[in-house]
Amino acid sequence: ANSQAKGKMETYKMDEVSPDMSFLEMMDVLNEQLMVQGIEPVAFDHDCREGICGMCSMFINGEAHGPDRLVTTCQLHMRKFKDGDTITIEPFRAEAFPVIKDLTVDRSAFDRVQQAGGFVSVNTSGNTQDANAIPIDKHDADKAFDAATCIGCGACWRRRGRRRGQRRAAACGGPRQRALIPVVLR
């Protein structure tokens, strides 16, 4: 497994893709078609399919999780694409995420950072029992909310290995992302 290893692109043509399908449902249909044809299915990670675990992370047309900002791959729907579009799907290719197979990457480095306390704590100057009694400054509340929205997908880690001219990870941008990136660079 090596994040710099050359892979190869495969082309698959799909018919009968409903605009209401999620991107992962489309991948499931593709894999069913491949298995019927005796072709090995495309390996990809997924878990909750509800946008809360981050396991489904992949690059779609050069963007983390695809064309929608603040949407995970499992929340992306096929209506975002036109009938007949060619969609390029790639694994997260970063030094921290060696490719295991197809779109599956080894996330263990990121998991270790999270287990070691890779999180942002925002002081909102109160404790649980005072939560509804103490007014919180809007700036502090916004910082706390931004930190809490991180689902640990790892899109922010892709920044390190990006080529010039690529846009930053589309799904993130808050303080948690900025706090985790220095951990990767050390």
Put a short name on every predicted segment.
Residues 42-79, 145-165, 186:
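Local cysteine-cluster metal-coordination motifs and their immediate loop/turn environment
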Residues 11, 20-23, 45, 53-55:
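A common structural microfeature
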Residues 3-6, 64-68, 82-83:
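Short, solvent-exposed loop/turn segments that connect beta-strands within catalytic domains
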Residues 1-16:
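Eukaryote-biased recognition of intrinsically disordered, low-complexity regulatory segments
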Residues 21-40, 87-186:
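Ferredoxin-type iron-sulfur electron-transfer modules in oxidoreductases and energy-metabolism complexes
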Residues 69-95:
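A surface-exposed, charged beta-strand/loop segment in the N-terminal or early-internal portion
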Residues 10-12, 72, 87, 173:
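Extracytoplasmic/periplasmic beta-strand context in beta-sandwich domains
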